[in-house]
Amino acid sequence: MIKIFRILFFINISLCCGEFYAQNESFKVMAWNILHGGNDIENGQQNVVKIIKEIDPDIILMVETYGSGPYIANELGYNFHLVASDGTSVDNKSVNLSVFSKFPFGDRIDTDHPFFLGGSEIIIHGIKMRFLSNWFHYLPWNNEPEKMGKTAEELLEWEKTEHRYSMIQKVLPYFEKYASQSDLIPVIVGGDMNSPSHLDWSKKTKKIHNNLVVPWYATKIFEDIGFLDSFREKNPNPLKKPGITWDNKMRNDSHR
């Protein structure tokens, strides 16, 4: 369901922008689902390394790591944190989420649902920040929900079927907790929401979505608890800069 080489140059949802300024310094965060550890194509891991090197992020919030983390980190010189129970082998091929950083790690951020959410503190220019990598289930999914013959209200009800909505309920308390503490410890979240963005389904864009305005729950819930979408903060016009991803430089995935 998830396209190969999904990439966001700045993290998707955060309490601060993709680039953070403190003491005249900045850092760049990248959120990326590399699809099955990058192993679905020939030389996939090497291509992952090449793309990361081109973008040169300071921090990477990775999804679908699946054992490729140590190779990527060693090739590029990043510190590496696997979102899994303490003591899990870093090359475990069943572990989804991970964090890479040029800066030193602080304390682990563990949850009861490490396949969906977890991360680490990172110390940046003397400032402690929290970084969370997350993954929401891809079901229910439709490539063109505007063509399903449903109203906005019916689409929101449809969104609650299958797995994604129930998964969000399990990890929502963690997001609420860290958002409430963000005045003391800033928090950045990046990953794979497996959902259209409500900011791309507004009144400004309804003409390309069958006149539908849909406040998609999987992204709207972050706004409701105080997070900002850093991509949309930096690129406020969703028609000129749609929040899409790509699996190669010739083909866009029009929603995710």
Residue spans of the language-model regions?
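Active-site-proximal beta-strand elements of phosphoester/diester hydrolases
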Residues: 26-36, 128-158
